[in-house]
């Protein structure tokens, strides 16, 4: 009886699984005929759910198998065959295959077995360098060592990776990324090591967007932000929405960064003397590149090196730095004006450019300051052109020769009072004795003529001191005495030599006999004898004519159309001159802004003092050596601690007691002579 009960119990326990599992496929079998009538799969197999540990193990195994394949390395049991012509060697990995091809089949020039033609399969690509053929071989070998930091995709060649990275980049990434080769994006953003995947990097675009991945919080180069904060929910990163005015701030940063870089490059060209500082055309062309940019210094005040950026809004439980103020971005320091010496040199170069702009021949001549062709500079100006003296003398020069006070108060040639005159008079004009040389005569006196007792008509008298005496003596005004430091006045007016390249008016023709004064009828009154202006104009067909063969055809106007054409030409020339003047003013203002910026940095001490200290320390021995003007070679030896601690008197005694006492005595005599 008990055995029967045990058997029944065992039967019930064995039947219980089927009994419990049997009702489950019933609803499935009712739904399947409508969509899959031929499905006869047993229910327990299709509805079984594996445990979580089994799923994790399978995923890990799949990742372990797929990772080597992504990098181009096959499993250990798989061999890679070399398909080079005439080679059947097998390599365990793609890297080994690549090394085999480079060393065995390509070879090297040093070993005299260099092969620049690819013989992989049917490929017959030929290159000119070994680097090119080795780069081409990567196409055939499944080696992908270059991995994308954003999506994890691997590539065979670095240029392929570079093209792929551009697909991830947007405008904000291109602006924020530093110079090429400085740092890769993974080093700039330090959030990859905080538990997020390498593909979770998110670059905030210029427009409003919601990222699908976590935001790797970090600060790129020249950006400052608050310390990262781990969110409460570990499955989500910090997600930021850009505000509506973020695009405007982004564009402002772009323009300022562009102008900042252009200004730094301009300072670098100045340091390296890339263009001629004394050429007006070269200076103007170089400044034109800066005028079209929005330089930060043109806004007034010192150059700002940081600007606030719009604060992002944090969502999803992340950390929002907006509550502590907007973060700021820092412009990189200018590498070409880091030290004090750089600032001083740049200021000197800018001054040379300023002198070149101010001394431009065209603008100085247009302003009436100097005319090309003559050796004269207006006395009222504080500068003169070095390459183009004026053509004609202004009225002030003629007046300067009439009186002593006017002529001596107007420094026409800018000559020193006790030095050699700027323009020495010719020997034929005036003759000086040793007592009456231009240097010995005081500037307060004038040259007085010598008094002769006998009236010798062979030599003319020198001009007298006053205007009345000179007129009474029969000498013209132009031949009056000039100051001893200036050119004599005998070459003025019409007797002065004409310079070439100038347009001169033709001499008018002789008067016609019909308009000459009639003196035959003496009995008539004056009104009848002398023709009036009206009669003279009516009697003549045309006014005083100038011979046509002496006039430039371009200056001859005989019809209204020619007059209109001349008027249009004059207007166009005026517009060109006005435009040139405005450009000249812009160049002058830009140079003034640049010099004020350099001066402000020098005043505030905004430069790297460490490099200046090193430079001065390195240059001090040379300066000290140049300062000793002894005239004999001196041997330099390192200074020991004993010599440093010794008093100056003991050093002097030791120096005088050694070597050359006689030479030191000579040096002392020379110093005494120099002081006297």
Swiss-Prot record:
<keyword id="KW-0678">Repressor</keyword>
<feature type="compositionally biased region" description="Low complexity">
    <location>
        <begin position="32"/>
        <end position="55"/>
    </location>
</feature>
<keyword id="KW-0862">Zinc</keyword>
<feature type="region of interest" description="Disordered">
    <location>
        <begin position="605"/>
        <end position="676"/>
    </location>
</feature>
<feature type="zinc finger region" description="C2H2-type 1">
    <location>
        <begin position="80"/>
        <end position="105"/>
    </location>
</feature>
<keyword id="KW-0843">Virulence</keyword>
<dbReference type="GO" id="GO:0071469">
    <property type="term" value="P:cellular response to alkaline pH"/>
</dbReference>
<keyword id="KW-0238">DNA-binding</keyword>
<feature type="compositionally biased region" description="Low complexity">
    <location>
        <begin position="476"/>
        <end position="486"/>
    </location>
</feature>
<dbReference type="InterPro" id="IPR036236">
    <property type="entry name" value="Znf_C2H2_sf"/>
</dbReference>
<feature type="compositionally biased region" description="Basic and acidic residues">
    <location>
        <begin position="605"/>
        <end position="615"/>
    </location>
</feature>
<feature type="region of interest" description="Disordered">
    <location>
        <begin position="380"/>
        <end position="545"/>
    </location>
</feature>
<dbReference type="GO" id="GO:0008270">
    <property type="term" value="F:zinc ion binding"/>
</dbReference>
<keyword id="KW-0863">Zinc-finger</keyword>
<keyword id="KW-0805">Transcription regulation</keyword>
<feature type="zinc finger region" description="C2H2-type 2">
    <location>
        <begin position="116"/>
        <end position="140"/>
    </location>
</feature>
<dbReference type="InterPro" id="IPR050806">
    <property type="entry name" value="pacC/RIM101"/>
</dbReference>
<feature type="compositionally biased region" description="Polar residues">
    <location>
        <begin position="425"/>
        <end position="445"/>
    </location>
</feature>
<comment type="similarity">
    <text>Belongs to the pacC/RIM101 family.</text>
</comment>
<feature type="region of interest" description="Disordered">
    <location>
        <begin position="1"/>
        <end position="55"/>
    </location>
</feature>
<feature type="compositionally biased region" description="Basic and acidic residues">
    <location>
        <begin position="506"/>
        <end position="531"/>
    </location>
</feature>
<keyword id="KW-0010">Activator</keyword>
<feature type="compositionally biased region" description="Low complexity">
    <location>
        <begin position="394"/>
        <end position="413"/>
    </location>
</feature>
<dbReference type="GO" id="GO:0005737">
    <property type="term" value="C:cytoplasm"/>
</dbReference>
<keyword id="KW-0539">Nucleus</keyword>
<dbReference type="InterPro" id="IPR013087">
    <property type="entry name" value="Znf_C2H2_type"/>
</dbReference>
<feature type="short sequence motif" description="YPX[LI] motif 2">
    <location>
        <begin position="660"/>
        <end position="663"/>
    </location>
</feature>
<dbReference type="GO" id="GO:0043565">
    <property type="term" value="F:sequence-specific DNA binding"/>
</dbReference>
<keyword id="KW-0677">Repeat</keyword>
<dbReference type="GO" id="GO:0045944">
    <property type="term" value="P:positive regulation of transcription by RNA polymerase II"/>
</dbReference>
<feature type="compositionally biased region" description="Low complexity">
    <location>
        <begin position="7"/>
        <end position="23"/>
    </location>
</feature>
<comment type="function">
    <text>pH-responsive transcription factor required for epithelial invasion and pathogenicity in leukopenic mice. Modulates expression of genes encoding secreted enzymes, as well as cell wall and gliotoxin biosynthetic activities, during invasive aspergillosis. Plays a role in zinc homeostasis and represses the expression of the zinc-uptake transporters zrfA, zrfB and zrfC under zinc-limiting conditions in a pH-dependent manner. Binds to the pH response DNA consensus sequence 5'-GCCARG-3' or PR site in target genes promoters.</text>
</comment>
<keyword id="KW-0804">Transcription</keyword>
<feature type="short sequence motif" description="YPX[LI] motif 1">
    <location>
        <begin position="459"/>
        <end position="462"/>
    </location>
</feature>
<keyword id="KW-0479">Metal-binding</keyword>
<keyword id="KW-0963">Cytoplasm</keyword>
<protein>
    <recommendedName>
        <fullName>pH-response transcription factor pacC/RIM101</fullName>
    </recommendedName>
</protein>
<feature type="compositionally biased region" description="Basic and acidic residues">
    <location>
        <begin position="623"/>
        <end position="640"/>
    </location>
</feature>
<dbReference type="GO" id="GO:0005634">
    <property type="term" value="C:nucleus"/>
</dbReference>
<feature type="zinc finger region" description="C2H2-type 3">
    <location>
        <begin position="146"/>
        <end position="168"/>
    </location>
</feature>
């Amino acid at each position: 009886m008990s055995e029967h009960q045990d058997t029944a119990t065992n039967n019930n326990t064995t039947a219980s699984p089927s009994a419990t599992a049997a009702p489950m496929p019933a609803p499935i079998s009712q739904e399947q005929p409508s969509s899959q009538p031929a499905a006869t799969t047993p229910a327990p197999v299709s509805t079984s759910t594996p445990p979580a540990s089994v799923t994790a193990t399978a995923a890990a195994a799949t990742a372990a198998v797929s990772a080597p394949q992504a990098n181009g390395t096959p499993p250990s049991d798989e061999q890679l065959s070399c398909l080079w012509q005439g080679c059947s060697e097998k390599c365990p990995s793609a890297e080994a295959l690549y090394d085999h091809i480079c060393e065995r089949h390509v070879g090297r020039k040093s070993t005299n077995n260099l092969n620049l033609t690819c013989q992989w399969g049917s490929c017959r690509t030929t290159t000119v360098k070994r680097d090119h053929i080795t780069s081409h071989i990567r196409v055939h070998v499944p080696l992908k060592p270059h991995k994308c930091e954003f999506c994890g995709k691997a590539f065979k060649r670095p240029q392929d990776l570079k093209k792929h990275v551009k697909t991830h980049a947007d405008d904000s990434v291109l602006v924020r990324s530093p110079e090429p080769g400085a740092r890769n994006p993974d080093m700039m953003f330090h959030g990859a090591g905080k538990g997020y995947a390498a593909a979770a990097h998110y670059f905030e675009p210029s427009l409003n967007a919601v990222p699908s991945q976590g935001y790797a919080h970090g600060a790129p180069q020249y950006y400052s932000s608050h310390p990262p904060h781990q969110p409460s929910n570990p499955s989500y990163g910090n997600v930021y929405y850009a505000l509506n005015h973020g695009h405007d701030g982004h564009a402002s940063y772009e323009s300022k960064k562009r102008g900042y870089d252009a200004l730094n490059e301009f300072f670098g060209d100045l340091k390296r003397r890339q263009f001629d500082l004394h050429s007006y055309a070269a200076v103007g062309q170089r400044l034109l590149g800066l005028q079209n940019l929005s330089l930060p210094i043109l806004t007034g005040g010192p150059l700002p090196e940081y600007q606030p950026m719009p604060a992002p809004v944090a969502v999803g439980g992340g950390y929002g730095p907006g509550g502590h103020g907007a973060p700021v971005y820092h412009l990189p320091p200018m590498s070409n004006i880091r030290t004090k010496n750089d600032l001083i040199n740049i200021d000197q170069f800018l001054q040379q450019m300023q002198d070149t702009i101010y001394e431009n021949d065209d603008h100085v001549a247009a302003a009436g300051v100097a005319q090309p062709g003559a050796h004269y500079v207006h006395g009222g100006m504080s500068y003169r052109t070095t390459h183009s003296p004026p053509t004609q003398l202004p009225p002030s020069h003629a007046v300067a020769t009439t009186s002593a006070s006017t002529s001596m108060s107007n420094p026409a040639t800018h000559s020193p009072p006790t030095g050699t005159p700027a323009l020495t008079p010719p020997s034929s004009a005036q003759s000086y004795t040793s007592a009456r040389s231009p240097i010995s005569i005081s500037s307060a006196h004038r040259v007085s003529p010598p008094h002769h007792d006998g009236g010798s008509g062979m030599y003319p008298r020198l001009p007298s001191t006053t205007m009345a005496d000179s007129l009474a003596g029969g000498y013209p005004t132009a031949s009056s005495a000039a100051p001893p430091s200036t050119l004599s006045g005998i070459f003025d007016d019409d007797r002065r030599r004409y310079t070439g390249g100038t347009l001169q008016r033709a001499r008018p023709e002789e008067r016609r006999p019909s308009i000459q004064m009639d003196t035959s009828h003496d009995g008539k009154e004056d009104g009848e004898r002398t023709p009036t202006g009206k009669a003279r104009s009516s009697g003549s067909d045309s006014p005083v004519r100038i011979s046509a063969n002496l006039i430039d055809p371009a200056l001859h106007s005989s019809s209204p159309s020619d007059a209109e054409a001349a008027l249009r030409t004059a207007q166009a020339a005026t517009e060109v001159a006005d435009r040139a003047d405005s450009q000249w003013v812009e160049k002058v203002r830009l140079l003034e802004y640049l010099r004020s910026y350099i001066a402000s940095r020098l005043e505030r001490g905004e430069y790297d003092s460490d490099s200046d200290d090193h430079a001065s320390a390195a240059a001090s021995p040379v300066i000290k050596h140049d300062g000793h003007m002894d005239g004999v070679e001196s041997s330099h030896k390192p200074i020991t601690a004993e010599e440093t601690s010794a008093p100056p008197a003991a050093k002097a005694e030791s120096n005088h007691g050694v070597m050359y006492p006689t030479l030191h005595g000579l040096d002392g005599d020379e110093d005494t002579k120099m002081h006297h």
